[in-house]
A protein has these predicted regions:
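Long, well-ordered mid-to-C-terminal structural blocks that present hydrophobic/aromatic surfaces
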Residues: 225-270
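Active-site bordering "gate/hinge" segments
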Residues: 1-228, 366-371
Length: 372
């Protein structure tokens, strides 16, 4: 066993979810590569007399189920796991896929039913709102290949980004959180992007290893009908096993009224037609992890890229709620660092970030070189 899993598990149990004696914790592994970490979590949970429960989801089994399932089958599957989740006080989810096409062959209709009757019910409505939870990936050959690294190189990267000094990050985030809570108008200008919206009255929140590992973001949400202009994202993103590039959204009064994506505009619109809320924004956040520099086409890493922000169609964050409701929550990232084209972010007409660097004195501790 990689002994770095002991430190990671300690951070998960004591920092991320603050697990207590007699609490039920569901350790869910999606893909068998994550079992080594799951076993360490179960071991340490038992030491403090918590009650761990293990659920292993095999991607191939899930794929075959969805291909053959009726709508009623998916609804029953969701109801069953919803009842299990209701009994949990804590949750750790470990994902270890082996392919970009884990759900290849599942129709868009089935994926939408799965998102609506399983993901939304079990995770968005129950797990997110009623448990202490954290989700993370597990380092394997798949992630190493996506990162253009050897497995050992990726493991070193992984444990660096996961075991960053979150206490230092937490302190450095406070001035940004305070500024966001005082801000009305946000204006973002970058190649293919001229976007404005209000965040007035929407609470900002710091994320420093509590819900995601790796972590590092400060997030809020636009006032629902305030988003106007257009944005072109400069990272690849995956949703429902489809990889999208060069996504552009055009907004009028908060609604995405026009979309394009390289060779995938039809599929993009199908996702945004999931429900009425899918065409409105549910999160605006800065990525701040000093060790995450480039996209992996994996949201859990990409949304933490330093010098980036994400603007998220779909369900609003509970902590920064603008009232938007949807079965989707899709974090799509735009990197503002100079090598990615640069860009500027203004708060109430004051420049706060240029080319991925905070320029206000009170925010400079959040720049990557100061968080390492």
């Amino acid at each position: 066993m990689d002994n770095r899993n002991e430190k990671l598990t300690h951070n998960l149990i004591y920092n991320s979810i603050s697990l207590n004696e007699n609490e039920n914790i569901l350790v869910e592994v999606i893909g068998e590569d994550g079992l080594e970490l799951a076993n360490e979590i179960i071991k340490q949970a038992k030491i403090i007399n918590a009650k761990p429960h293990l659920n292993i989801i095999n991607y191939e089994d899930l794929r075959n189920f969805l291909i053959n399932a009726t709508k009623e089958d998916i609804i029953e599957y969701g109801k069953k796991d919803y009842e299990i989740m209701k009994k949990m006080q804590a949750y750790i989810g470990i994902s270890a896929p082996t392919s970009d096409k884990s759900l290849n062959g599942v129709s868009q209709e089935k994926l939408e039913l799965y998102n609506k009757y399983y993901i939304a019910l079990v995770h968005l409505d129950q797990r997110v709102k009623h448990t202490k939870w954290c989700i993370l990936r597990y380092p394997n050959e798949y992630f190493a290949q996506k990162s253009n690294m050897t497995l050992n190189e990726f493991k070193d990267f992984y444990y660096n980004v996961c075991n960053v000094d979150y206490n230092k990050m937490k302190i450095a985030m406070e001035p940004l959180k305070k500024l966001m809570n005082q801000t009305d108008k946000v204006h973002i200008v970058a190649p293919g992007t001229d976007l404005s919206f209000s965040i007035k009255g929407i609470p900002a929140e710091k994320y420093y290893g509590t819900f995601n590992i790796p972590d590092g973001e400060v997030a809020t949400c636009p006032v629902k009908d305030s988003v106007n202009g257009y944005i072109t994202y400069n990272t690849k993103t995956k949703y429902n096993d489809i990889i999208f590039e060069d996504i552009r959204f055009d907004f009028i009064y908060g609604e995405i009224i026009k979309t394009t994506a390289k060779e995938k505009t039809k599929e993009l619109n199908e996702i945004l037609d999931t429900d009425d809320g899918a065409r409105y924004i549910g999160e605006f956040a800065f990525g701040l992890n000093p060790y995450v520099n480039n996209t992996m086409c994996d949201t859990l890493f990409d949304e933490k890229i330093n010098g980036s922000f994400h603007l998220t169609p779909g369900m609003a964050l509970e902590e920064s709620d603008n009232g938007n409701r949807s079965a989707i929550h899709w974090d799509i990232v735009k990197i503002l660092r100079k090598e990615f084209g640069g860009g500027e972010i203004y708060f109430d007409d004051i420049l706060i970030m240029k080319d991925g660097k905070f320029i206000l004195e009170e925010l400079k501790e959040l720049n990557a070189e100061n968080l390492k």
